[in-house]
Amino acid sequence: MKIGELAKVTKCTTETIRYYEKSGLLPMPERNESNYRLYNQTHEYRLNFIRNCRSLAMSHEEIRSLLILMDKPPADCSDVNYLLDEHINHVDTRLQELIELKEQLNHLQQQCQNEDVIDHCGILQGLQTMEHNEKKHSHLK
């Protein structure tokens, strides 16, 4: 199948498919005599796997590690389980960061008196004066 057909069956854009190829997550397909990419069912399964991992907020490196394990399976799936544990820890960290972010936003919102003119807006003043948190939020990566 050509790239457009693969995109259609996987509900993915052709740009995303090319991106996954360039990043090494999706193997490069063979090409026909007209130099069109020719994909097979293995590409379809792998692309669905990648997209499912991305829907679980897994990074490309996590997906790459899972693909390596999938391509060269060990005697058991303990390595896969370990990777999933690591990802769960990342999700827990992100949840805590989001809770802290929500608390900051709620605090800012409490500074607002709706009847104030914009020059006296507590939210805008708070955004100008609050301490900048140097901590990088994982959801911005």
Regions found by a protein language model. Give the residues of each.
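The DNA-recognition helices of helix-turn-helix-type DNA-binding domains
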Residues: 23-24, 33, 70, 112, ...
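Alpha-helix boundary/capping residues
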Residues: 51-54, 70, 87, 112
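Basic helix-turn-helix/winged-helix DNA-binding cores
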Residues: 1-68
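Context-gated lysine
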Residues: 2, 8-11, 22, 72, ...
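C-terminal regulatory/oligomerization modules of transcriptional regulators
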Residues: 75-141
